[in-house]
Amino acid sequence: MGQTNSRHSLIETDEPTTSSRVSMLVDRVKLLWKRYTTPLSTEDGSREAHFAVPSENYADTPSRNTPNSSNGFPSETLVTSSAHCSTQPHKDEAYSHHGYSSTMALDDSSLAQTYHEYEEGTSGNSPLRRAIGSYDFLHPRPSGNSSRLDRNSSRPFTSSFHSAPFLSSYGSSNDPSQERVNEYSLPSNSNSTYTTPLQSINNEHPLPTVLENNALLNNSGNSPSLINHLRQYLNQDFSRLHQSPSPIPNSNDNDSQTRRSSWSSIASAFNDFPEEFPNASNPEAHSNFTPLNGNDESTVNMLSRLLSAAAIETVASIMNSEARNMDSQNMANGEPSRFRSVDGSFEQFLTDLRSGNLTNVLQNSSQNGNDQISSDPESNSSDLQYLRMFRFPSFHQSHNQPASNNEASDTNGPALVPVLIVCMRSISETSEDHAPTMTQENQSLHNESRENISINDITERMAQSTEFSTDLPPTFERSNSTFSHPEPTRSDFSQAFTPVSDFPANLFPGSRNLFPTSNSGNQSTSSFSRYNQPTVSVDLRNSSILRRAQEPVNGSTGENHIGDDYISSLLDSSNSNSQRPFSTVPSESNVFSRNASGNFSMSQTHQPTTDNTSSFSTQPGRLSTGLHHFPSDRDLLSNQTRRSSLARSYRFEEQLSVDDNTSDFSTLASNGAADMVTQTHSEGTFSNSTHGDWLIYVFGGLFPEHHPVLSTVSLFSDNPMYEDLLALTTYLGPAKKPVASHEDVKRSGGLFAYFDDASLSSADSCLICLETYTNGDICRKLQACKHFFHQACIDQWLTTGNNSCPLCRAHGVTTQAEEEN
């Protein structure tokens, strides 16, 4: 009567089941029959059963209605002999479906009859029994490409098809179809295309648990991040042998080999845990390693870790954000990191550092091949110096995407090439003062030598210059408040620095900007330049570059005790019972102590002069930051004068911010150079009458692709040429920033007394000393930009730091020379 669906009505059964149950069973049996039963004839006339083998991809869905295949099953067949299958068709009508032929007519009446036969258990050899009773043999474990759930040989093959409702309904323990009947088993003879032993097949495979699935799905996300590699690398003790705990997730999966190879390539860049690290007890671990005595070895290895960590962090910081994001995606996908230098020199440099071989690195790169660290106290060997530049591929080069100049200019501008510059200077100073014995002839020769270029001048300009020339892009980020710290009073800042003599502009890198001194004795000293210079912040989380706690010899106060086991564990990264002797000079320093609120506050400690054999014992629970020596002599290249300069130096405790939750601290440098100065002691390779400082500069920048410095090949080699070094100093700009005189500052005016006014509410603290303004404070306002600061702070800044506004870098005051011009 116009019905489009001419289906026969189902035969009613005597079973107390609902029509929905029958309908579900019919649909399931129909689907099963269409997939698996297809009797056919062979050439010899025997009847063989033709079964469709399910694809390995069917684990996601039990049925797929695709036009080219029967519900997602390929046209592979399993051929069995005629002895195992009935040759009698169930009906005379023929039926075909998607290329699979059958002699049974699948109408609703026949299916209902089959259902009755199954329920009554009288059809042991019926087509339904052949289809359902042997379903466990129709899902064998593939012998070829297997799913990732089956890569473990000890895990049986599982899939969602085994847990499908139409199979689990017949999977009860009292179901006779689960018994292994030889009549329906697949033989392992030559006629079978399936070679997996039958005994390995089971129809009750346990499905993976939720935890196992999550572990497999999230396996690619278990890779440690770069900062974790860095944390592990810094926390290891280079003076001991370490067996590396593998950062690769423990898994027996075959696909983990890809992750292992990718992680091995990443580990080769950082090599956090070498299996055997060279030390005094195992010098054969590295062919070029020179054994050092206990404390010397710890110091050199600590310097190696520090320099390596700073280099890796700086490289990551100068890579543009697009390259960093792409590199993170590559690492997440199991591909190796793309942070590689062009010629591989940076990797070799890190390898030398990871070998604890800092001394040999410096010796091999010194200007004079005979310059070595000697134990002879009368030795006049030059200070070891090291300068290396490393070039990294740009974003387009690293991803093999050559773009024309027009395309680069239209989209993101010219391609910028990351360049890393590493400088180290080892300064060995003697307590003997040779300055009075210097003759006039030697002094004239010394002054003449200052006109020549040297690596000292290079490192000096690197530290002093805050900007490159106009042809170069800005290299360092400007930051007015890079780290948080307590609010000290102005008296604390004025007492924190005890200058002994005036610092010349061409002396130690960053000395004028880091530690400003006044030319007049009545002018207060404040630490201002470190908060407003372009800085490179080396962010190393949970690491141990904080120097180990050291107990002052005479009269130490208990203010520097920190009752925090977590901080103590950071400080005590190696042998907590080791002793580290080194020489000291009279100084006043700041010691940070933790208050009740969890912050660190400064306190003053005076450390008297001690001889060279004085020792400081390492004790956990104490925090002492980096020790800095800054000679105050004007001469730069004279070894004898430089040796005597430390007798008139002072000590400054580097100010750090430590976050209780993340153990995050940042070491700030002046004018864009990461000054990481660590004192070594006089034992073993150093004589007892000498002590030395290491000056380490690690910073980088982005240069245009066609910049002349990138075409200078020798700058990126171990032995740069004199002319190229001279050109590099030109690119870096002048070492000394223009300053104003006291007369120029006084003539500029702008003095006023601060009172809490609505018009000044936006500037509630001085950005130089970071102290909150109080009523009655004398301030000076710059005429060019209208920014104001404490009079003492801004006067010190303009006369000793830079004649510019600390906030906006606008011109400070007009000098007399500018007025004349």
Curated annotation (Swiss-Prot):
Residues 517-529, 568-578 have a biased composition (Low complexity). A zinc finger (RING-type) spans 766-809. Keywords: Metal-binding, Zinc, Zinc-finger. It comes from the Eukaryota. Residues 1-20, 55-96, 134-205, 240-263, 274-293, 360-381, 430-450, 467-497, 512-535, 549-641 are annotated as: Disordered. This is Uncharacterized RING finger protein C4G3.12c. It holds the Pfam family zf-RING_2. One of its GO terms (molecular function) is zinc ion binding. The keyword Metal-binding applies.
